């Protein structure tokens, strides 16, 4: 499935139906009074969060959405039916912005959540509404009110518990495919991953969602490369898994480049809990591993884990560390006891 995380769409709610001019006509009643009904309200435009979606690709092919006009009023004081609504189905984590792509309208984070983006126009009054003591047979009715029209932006921020970050070829895609059922493209060249991938990790009876974010390079926050566009997807993550390839000559510099990009991007990304791990250690000798681990520890000031997605050495330790942090975060969010036995 192709991935699209941003789309501009044009929406319009339905016009209200017109009121009716009608008079009661029955046998033996020569002068029936007015009985024109009101017009129905126009249809609304809604955004609805549905399960099973993780892209906005449908909005690449259709950008214009218009709800139905309300039904016209009829005789016998019959109100026109309401116009049909239009529902924009979106994935969990979709944010909706005004046309300026800056002003937030709503943030949709739960399946079943919905938001009315445009309200249908009210129906017009039928002639029955205009009856007065001095005008018992009005021949006047109102047209319905026009619906609302606006352009909006849909922007998807994937909701994952953990986000994989690192330079291109840090082994993120290999890691994801090794620990989940996700099948991202894996190859020996930079920028293999061109859009985020999600996978579910299961370990020790626990599970969490892991996102593979396209590799960052120096200057990404200024638009260099492709990773800066997707940093928004890790804003909701509870923990960042920062991978540094053991094949990097200067692992400390590789770590610092990504940290700088996270800090420059802002939105508190650099404040998130981080697990630092040296990947692809199957390519190193025991002595080389220790040297690079020590070099990383000096700049990170925290423990540095090591693993190989190929040999699976150290892999479960990394997953358990991530699952532990995520579980603590979930308990804190629920206001429960954050201790884990």
From Swiss-Prot:
Localisation: Cytoplasm
The protein's predominant localisation is cytoplasm
Give the EC number(s) under which this enzyme is classified: 3.6.5.-
Obg domain residues = 1-159
Molecular function in Gene Ontology: GTP binding; GTPase activity; magnesium ion binding
A Pfam family matched in the record: GTP1_OBG
Question: Cofactor(s) for this protein?
Answer: Mg(2+)
* GO cellular component entries: cytoplasm
Q: What class of enzyme is it?
A: hydrolase
Name the Gene Ontology biological process terms: ribosome biogenesis
Q: Which residues form the signal peptide?
A: none
Q: Where does Mg(2+) bind?
A: 173, 193
Positions of GTP binding: 166-173, 191-195, 212-215, 279-282, 308-310
For this UniProt record, give its keywords in alphabetical order, as a comma-separated list.
Cytoplasm, GTP-binding, Hydrolase, Magnesium, Metal-binding, Nucleotide-binding
Assembly description: Monomer.
Q: What does this protein do?
A: An essential GTPase which binds GTP, GDP and possibly (p)ppGpp with moderate affinity, with high nucleotide exchange rates and a fairly low GTP hydrolysis rate. Plays a role in control of the cell cycle, stress response, ribosome biogenesis and in those bacteria that undergo differentiation, in morphogenesis control.
State the similarity comment. Belongs to the TRAFAC class OBG-HflX-like GTPase superfamily. OBG GTPase family.
User: What's the name of the protein?
Assistant: GTPase Obg
Q: Which gene encodes it?
A: obg
């Amino acid at each position: 499935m192709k991935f699209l995380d941003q789309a501009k769409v044009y929406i319009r709610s339905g016009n209200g139906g017109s009121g009716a001019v009608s008079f009661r006509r029955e046998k033996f009643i020569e002068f029936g009074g007015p009985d024109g009904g009101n017009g129905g309200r126009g249809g609304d435009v809604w955004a609805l969060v549905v399960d099973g979606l993780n892209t906005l690709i449908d909005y690449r092919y259709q950008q214009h959405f218009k709800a139905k006009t309300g039904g016209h009023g009829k005789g016998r004081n019959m109100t026109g039916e309401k116009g049909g609504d239009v529902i924009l189905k979106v994935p969990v984590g979709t944010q909706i912005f005004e046309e300026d792509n800056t002003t937030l309208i709503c943030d949709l984070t739960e399946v079943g959540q919905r938001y009315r983006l445009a309200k249908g126009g009210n129906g017009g009054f039928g002639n029955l509404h205009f009856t007065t003591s001095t005008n018992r047979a009005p021949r006047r009715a109102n047209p319905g009110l026009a619906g609302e029209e606006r352009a909006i932006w849909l922007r998807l921020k994937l909701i994952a518990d953990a986000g994989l970050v690192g330079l291109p070829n840090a082994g993120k895609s290999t890691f994801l495919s090794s620990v989940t059922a996700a099948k991202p493209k894996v190859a020996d060249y930079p920028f293999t991953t061109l859009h985020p991938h999600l996978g579910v990790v299961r370990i020790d009876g626990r599970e969490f969602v892991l996102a593979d974010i396209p590799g960052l390079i120096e200057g990404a926050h200024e638009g260099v490369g492709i990773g800066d566009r997707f940093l928004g997807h890790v804003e909701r993550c509870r923990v960042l898994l920062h991978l540094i390839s053991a094949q990097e000559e200067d692992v400390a510099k590789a770590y610092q480049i990504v940290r700088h990009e996270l800090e420059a991007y802002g939105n508190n990304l650099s404040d998130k809990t981080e697990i630092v791990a040296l990947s692809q250690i199957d390519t190193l000798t025991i002595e080389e591993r220790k040297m690079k681990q020590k070099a990383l520890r000096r700049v990170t000031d925290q423990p540095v884990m090591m693993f190989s997605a190929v040999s699976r050495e150290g892999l479960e330790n990394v997953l358990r560390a991530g699952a532990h942090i995520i579980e603590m975060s979930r308990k804190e969010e629920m206001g429960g006891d954050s201790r884990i036995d």
